[in-house]
C-alpha cells in the first residue's frame, strides 16, 4: 500500500497563535517539533499496519518545517515549494492508495480556530458553490481528481466536523477546540 500525507502546522496540538507558526519567532521551534512528532507517529503506525511506502508533503509556509532527520525508513519527505498548482498535495498521483492529512485547521473566516485561513492569510474567506472552502476541501477535491480516497485527518475540532460533511467515513483526531482567538488544547502526547 502506498500512502500520501499532507501536513500543516496550524492544526497540530498546542499551536494557538499566529506568531507560533512563523520561523523567525522563538516559540516556533517547539511547534515545528510537534508537527514533526505528529507526522512521525502517523508514519510509524501506518508502517506497522502494513503500508509499504509513504510520501509526506510539508505543506506549511515555505514547506521546510518537518525535521527530515526524524523520518522513519520507507518515508519520503517533500520539502520546499515546487511552484506546482496543487501546492500542499504536490507529489500525489494516481499510484497512491490513500491520503491522510495532519495538522489541518478550519477555513478562512470560521470562528472554530484562532488560526483559520485558506491557503493564505490575505483572504477573509473563499467560497466554492456557496460553501466556505477549507484547505481540507481543496485538497480532498485534488485527491478525488487522482481517484485517491481520503481516510484520515487530524486537526482542530472544527475541521474534523467539516470533514465529515465531505467524507462521511473519514477517521479524525481532534487536537484542540477553537473559540474565537483562543484554543482549548489537548495534551500533545494525547494526539500522538
What is each stretch, according to the model?
Residues 1-4:
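Extreme N-terminal starter segment of soluble prokaryotic enzymes
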Residues 79-122:
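N-terminal glycine-rich phosphate/adenylate-binding segment common to multiple enzyme folds
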Residues 142-192:
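Active-site rim beta-loop-alpha module in soluble metabolic enzymes
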Amino acid at each position: 500500500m502506498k500512502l500520501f500525507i499532507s501536513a500543516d502546522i496550524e492544526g497540530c496540538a498546542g499551536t494557538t497563535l499566529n506568531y507560533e507558526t512563523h520561523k523567525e519567532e522563538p516559540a516556533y521551534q517547539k511547534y515545528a517539533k510537534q508537527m514533526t512528532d505528529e507526522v512521525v507517529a502517523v508514519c510509524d503506525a501506518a508502517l506497522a499496519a502494513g503500508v509499504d511506502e509513504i510520501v509526506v508533503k510539508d505543506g506549511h509556509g515555505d514547506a521546510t518545517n518537518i525535521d527530515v532527520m526524524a523520518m522513519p525508513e520507507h518515508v519520503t519527505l517533500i520539502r520546499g515549494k515546487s511552484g506546482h498548482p496543487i501546492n500542499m498535495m504536490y507529489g500525489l498521483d494516481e499510484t497512491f492508495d490513500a491520503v491522510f492529512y495532519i495538522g489541518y485547521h478550519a477555513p478562512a473566516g470560521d470562528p472554530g480556530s484562532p488560526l483559520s485561513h485558506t491557503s493564505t492569510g490575505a483572504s477573509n474567506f473563499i467560497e466554492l458553490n456557496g460553501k466556505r472552502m477549507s484547505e481540507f476541501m481543496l485538497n480532498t477535491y485534488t485527491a478525488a481528481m487522482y481517484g485517491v480516497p481520503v481516510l484520515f485527518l487530524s486537526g482542530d475540532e472544527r475541521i474534523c466536523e467539516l470533514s465529515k460533511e465531505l467524507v462521511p467515513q473519514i477517521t479524525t483526531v481532534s487536537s484542540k477546540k477553537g473559540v474565537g482567538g483562543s484554543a482549548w488544547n489537548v495534551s500533545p502526547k494525547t494526539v500522538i
